């Protein structure tokens, strides 16, 4: 039988490995000479490879214990596991899949005991974990968020019987996350959010609930954040596509005006008032015609930049809303004015730069799951993309703010671009006809005159092919243990996520590359299953990126797959063995039959890799440091 000491020892090791893994990752962003940085990268990979099996054993043993051997567990065993579940929850460890699985396995035991206060924690824990996952997964996990948080709220009227003060907080944590996050994350309807907001506003007036404000100082703060969150949704309705009814909108107008007067009276200055209150108030005044949109923009612009200088004084501040939502609101308000185009453009560039700088460094202030959601909402929102004058500016913005937000993905994408460019050069020399498809609508002679454009396209496609991974960074950042089956299913979503990201008219030409780079040449294997790469007009470049993607991943001796590295020669043998099924046979033969190309590719993956990685790191690290200073 597993002892309690065994469980404690396993959890402590797991936490230690997790923290050390994060620490080594963070060291990669610190300034260092090339040799030192490469050593850090190798140390990080070695460590993660060494602890992966150990941590995987902990997860497997725990799952076995709580499922197949649960009849051997005593109450003390369950309480010990619960203790570490709490530690995982409060550590903000970005391990929601593990946390959700653990909470769901513990819940039946405490439900049998009718242990209200431990159940409150576990429901809240499961609600939190599933709400975080809902930011990157649009599946059934969204329903779990609402289900578990509503379970917490169902204990609301028992609040004065709780022995542990923290249990009271859970009630209002549930309200806050349902109202503030649920609607935007897609797991709560606007009508449900409105009903809960009214309910919360009502119970705040009841003595039964207000009596705990002193013993539980988080309660009034959580209530205010929840209600402000609903008001923010009204403020952001045009950006989010929310359809507020007249009753909802009037509720928000009345409450916002009241909030502004109260906050203005209490605050040290106008610039110390909560940003959400200020933005909502002046938006209402402009919509009513009490002030012009030009006046509203002038007031809010002044407030925004002076407020930013005061952020260090704020406690529990919502950076994502301030830097992303409000920057986008300022742009949308500008579009309602009759200001000269040059003045609008200057301001838009200023807001956009502030937003980009924040997103480039927001891992310092945001959970990774929150970062993913914010990154997608801001970077790919039509309001932002329409502010660029040409596709090149737009593409550079995407690469700089999204692709470079995750160093391993960025280095891999750059490596793929180098490999693709090298192969494509030989394609134009020896077999350019393979680039022509029935939908190309050009002759071979016409194609040959477009070599620079085709090469530029392939390089950009390589840089953007894995952009969907930036929507699941928390999953691909998990290196201290194997991915769970659920996490792997999320990972396999990255081609579709990439295609969703690239739906803008200037990116649509890269969409099939993102969708198809994990499909086999014959279209019979790979994912997504329903994408037909064989008949895509972009098939030649899909085939090219697929081969380059596999070459780099298999030969990468510096990054995360350190313990699975293969020699270049071995990879070439695998390409030859699977040409015609997994890989384009013409491209494989091209590599194998031309020694100069073979040597160039081998040079890139074996000798040039360190230089390429370090160059990417310097760009990434310098941007990171600059944005740290700015923020």
At which residue positions do the language-model features occur?
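Intrinsically disordered, glycine/charged-rich C-terminal tails and inter-domain linkers
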Residues: 7, 11-29, 46, 349-361, ...
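Helix-turn-helix repeat elements of alpha-solenoid scaffolds
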Residues: 8-17, 46-64, 89-108, 135-158, ...
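Amphipathic alpha-helical repeat scaffolds of TPR domains
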Residues: 12-49, 70-90, 115-136, 164-187, ...
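Flexible helix-coil transition and linker loops at the boundaries of alpha-helical arrays
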Residues: 63-75, 105-119, 151-168, 202-219, ...
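Histidine/acidic-rich helix-loop-helix segments that form or flank divalent-metal centers
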Residues: 168-169, 436-462, 502-547, 561-565, ...
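Extended, non-transmembrane interaction/recognition domains
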Residues: 267-269, 289-290, 295-368
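Acidic/His-rich, divalent-metal-binding segments that scaffold phosphate/diphosphate chemistry
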Residues: 361-489
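An active-site-proximal "capping" alpha-helix that borders the catalytic cofactor pocket
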Residues: 415-425, 487-503, 566-583
């Amino acid at each position: 039988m597993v002892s309690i000491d065994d469980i404690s020892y396993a959890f402590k090791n797991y936490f230690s490995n997790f923290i050390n893994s994060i620490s080594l990752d963070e060291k990669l962003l610190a300034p260092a000479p090339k040799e030192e940085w490469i050593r850090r990268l190798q140390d990080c990979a070695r460590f993660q490879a060494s602890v992966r099996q150990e941590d995987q054993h902990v997860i497997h043993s725990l799952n076995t214990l709580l499922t197949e051997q649960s009849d051997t567990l005593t109450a003390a065993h369950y309480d010990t596991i619960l203790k570490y579940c709490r530690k995982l929850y409060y550590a903000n460890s970005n391990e929601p899949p593990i946390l959700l699985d653990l909470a769901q396995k513990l819940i039946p035991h405490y439900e049998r005991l009718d242990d209200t206060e431990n159940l409150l924690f576990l429901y809240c824990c499961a609600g939190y974990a599933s709400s975080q996952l809902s930011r990157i997964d649009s599946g059934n996990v969204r329903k779990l968020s609402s289900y578990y948080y509503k379970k917490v709220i169902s204990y609301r009227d028992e609040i004065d019987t709780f022995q542990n003060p923290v249990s009271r907080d859970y009630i209002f944590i549930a309200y806050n996350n349902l109202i503030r996050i649920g609607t935007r994350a897609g797991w709560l309807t606007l009508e449900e959010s409105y009903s809960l907001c009214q309910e919360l506003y009502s119970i705040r007036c009841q003595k039964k609930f207000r009596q705990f404000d002193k013993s539980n100082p988080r309660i009034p703060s959580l209530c205010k954040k929840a209600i402000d969150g609903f008001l923010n949704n009204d403020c952001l309705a045009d950006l989010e596509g929310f359809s507020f009814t007249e009753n909802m909108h009037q509720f928000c107008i009345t409450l916002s005006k009241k909030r502004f007067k109260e906050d203005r009276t209490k605050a040290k200055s106008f610039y110390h008032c909560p940003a959400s209150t200020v933005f909502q108030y002046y938006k209402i005044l402009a919509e009513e015609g009490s002030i012009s949109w030009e006046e509203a923009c002038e007031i809010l612009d002044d407030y925004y930049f002076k407020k930013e200088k005061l952020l260090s004084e704020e406690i529990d501040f919502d950076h994502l809303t301030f830097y992303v939502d409000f920057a986008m609101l300022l742009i949308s308000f500008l579009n309602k004015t009759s200001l000269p185009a040059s003045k609008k453009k200057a301001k838009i560039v200023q807001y956009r730069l502030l937003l980009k700088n924040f997103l480039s460094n927001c891992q310092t202030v945001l959970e990774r799951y929150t970062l993913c959601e914010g990154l997608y909402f801001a970077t790919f929102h039509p309001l932002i993309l329409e502010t660029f004058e040409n596709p090149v500016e737009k593409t550079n913005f995407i690469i700089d703010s999204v692709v470079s937000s995750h160093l391993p993905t960025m280095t891999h994408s750059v490596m793929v671009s180098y490999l693709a460019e090298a192969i494509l050069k030989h394609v134009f020399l020896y077999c350019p006809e393979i680039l022509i498809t029935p939908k190309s609508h050009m002759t071979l002679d016409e194609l040959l005159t477009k070599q620079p454009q085709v090469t530029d396209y392939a390089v950009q496609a390589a840089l953007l092919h894995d952009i969907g991974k930036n929507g699941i960074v928390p999953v691909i950042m998990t290196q201290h243990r194997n991915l769970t089956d659920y996490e792997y299913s999320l990972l396999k979503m990255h081609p579709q996520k990439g295609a969703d990201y690239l739906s803008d008219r200037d990116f649509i030409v890269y969409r099939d590359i993102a969708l198809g780079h994990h499909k086999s040449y014959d279209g019979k294997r790979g994912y997504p299953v329903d994408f037909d790469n064989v008949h895509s007009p972009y098939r030649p470049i899909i085939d090219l990126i697929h081969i380059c993607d596999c070459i780099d991943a298999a030969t990468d001796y510096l990054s995360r797959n350190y313990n699975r590295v293969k020699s270049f020669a071995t990879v070439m043998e695998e390409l030859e063995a699977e040409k015609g099924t997994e890989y384009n046979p013409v491209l494989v033969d091209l590599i194998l039959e031309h020694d100069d190309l073979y040597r160039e590719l081998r040079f890139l993956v074996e000798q040039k890799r360190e230089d390429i990685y370090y160059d990417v790191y310097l760009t990434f690290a310098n941007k990171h440091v600059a944005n740290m200073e700015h923020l």
